[in-house]
Amino acid sequence: QVFNRMVPVANADNRTGIPFDWQMNVLRSDELNAWAMPGGKMAVYTGMVERLQLTDDEIAAVIGHEMTHALLEHSKKAIGGQVLTGLGGSILAGAVGLDGNLVGVGTDLLATKPFSRHQESEADAGGVRLMAQAGYNPQAAISVWEKMNRAQGGSQVAILSTHPANNTRIEAIRRMLPEVMPIYHQNKR
């Protein structure tokens, strides 16, 4: 339901010149993770939703973040177009061709570098805008990161070293609220 409400907003924001075939997969795993690939194939792990007890608004924050990675083609811009990372910090990489099609998920998975801090910040900002346009409360993006902090016990695993600290992300989102809250109020259902 959240995903379906966000797809038209993401399509309107698509500046790639290529229509996306948005697809959401739910993966059974305790991991705190979600990811997207060029072209709009996405996954959210059940652990993300269940362990953090995410509301619809918070799920929209996660989906918006990942949609923005796809819309800005971050994984294509990463090393050889082969990188795929998740919001929760776990890395999931697959052989992604330049056309954005996933080739051989499963045994062909490999780990490479996560997105840059700049790309993560772009995905946070774009995701907050997308969720507001879809009528979801942007303040929920803050609560997702607060829940991530609690789930991680306030520490961040080494793999997150290229990601902005959760508190830095929270502050950046907080600074965006004057811009995005009116958009949310205009679109909320």
Residue ranges of model-derived segments:
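Peri-catalytic and regulatory segments of divalent metal-dependent proteins
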Residues: 1-81, 129, 133-134, 153, ...
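DG-centered beta-turn motif at the end of beta-strands
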Residues: 65-66, 123, 165
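Short helix/loop segments within enzyme catalytic domains
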Residues: 1-18, 101-162, 170, 178-189
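Catalytic-site beta-strand/loop segments enriched in glycine and acidic/polar residues
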Residues: 60-71, 99-113
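Solvent-exposed loop/turn segments at secondary-structure junctions
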Residues: 30-32, 48-51, 69, 76-78, ...
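Post-HEXXH active-site segment of zinc metalloproteases
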Residues: 75-105, 142-145
